Amino acid sequence: EMSRGLGDVYKRQNEDGEGMRYVLGETLQEYQEEIMEKDRPSVFLATSQTARDCLEQAGMQYEGEINLKDVGFCKMETQQECLAGSLCIPKLLDILGERYKILFFINRHHIVIVDDDEFSYRLIRRIKRKKTRQGESKEKFIYNFMLEFISRDLELLGHYEKRIMDLEEGVMDGKIQGFQNAIMPIRRELLTLRSYYDEIMDMGKQLEENENGFFAKKQVKYFGVISDRADRLMSKASQLLEYAQQVRDAYKAQVDAQQNNNMQFLTVISTIFFPLTLITSWYGMNFHNMPELKHGYPGAVSYTHLTLPTILLV
């Protein structure tokens, strides 16, 4: 209910065409026009409908289209007036499903975040609840914001590791039924996460390069921390993919061993019954000059009686 109430505040302010605005400082404070200077460095939180108004308030000119539906990657581009970027963040409970899609814009003084899902709003609420130094600078806010949406990913990767270990134990115990249906989604999700972490790492490096000079030189170190964190997550995802492949190879070895056992059993059966098969083949031909043709059945029975003890001994 509390989450729903917070979302209502977010929607109401955006429906009024204002968006939300947080003034940068050690603690993020909602902007109050009556008591705060208009040009104070801020974070504007907007929806697609209020994005243009917020960009105008922040003194940014962006000529591109603002369409969250087109967001498909985490990337950033440098423009003359601002940095423009997008975030495409997998939902932890549905990695392969719909993602949180965000656009953001940065200039020398302000940050504008465009989000129709309230995800950014919830992240800011979490930052305000958990951090004592929430955003005394643009760099510190971006650092807190980006680390917050990957803060649970190491735990998530730990759950994947546990699932793969359980599958490995099953394979070692010969429980291989349903293995392929279990391992394939894990591999696909880990591949998705690895690509996502790679994109976040590249974005951190781009921010650290500070091509437009929008960031203080002493503050760009925060972006290096983001890159390092994403790099570690990407390495962990790669290790888990390799681990999953090793377990898959073990599964294939188990399947091959079972097939070999089946073939050996069938070979033994074929060897045992080969003499009987040979006898029935001979007497099924009915050649004209074949011995015992006139007394075929007694002959076949006699041969069978002679052969059976040998078969039983084998």
What does each of the following model-derived ranges do?
Residues 1-13, 305, 310-314:
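Single conserved hydrophobic/aromatic residue that forms the stacking wall/gate
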Residues 4, 8-133, 199, 203-215:
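Helix-boundary and N-terminal cytosolic regulatory elements
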Residues 7, 142, 146, 259, ...:
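Alpha-helical structural signal
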Residues 27, 89-91, 171, 175, ...:
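Short, well-ordered turn and helix-capping elements at secondary-structure junctions
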Residues 45-46, 147, 187:
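Conserved residues at beta->alpha junctions
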Residues 97-178:
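Switch/coupling subdomain of P-loop NTPase systems
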Residues 166-168, 175-283:
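Membrane-associated alpha-helical segments
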Residues 274-308, 312:
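Alpha-helical transmembrane anchor segments
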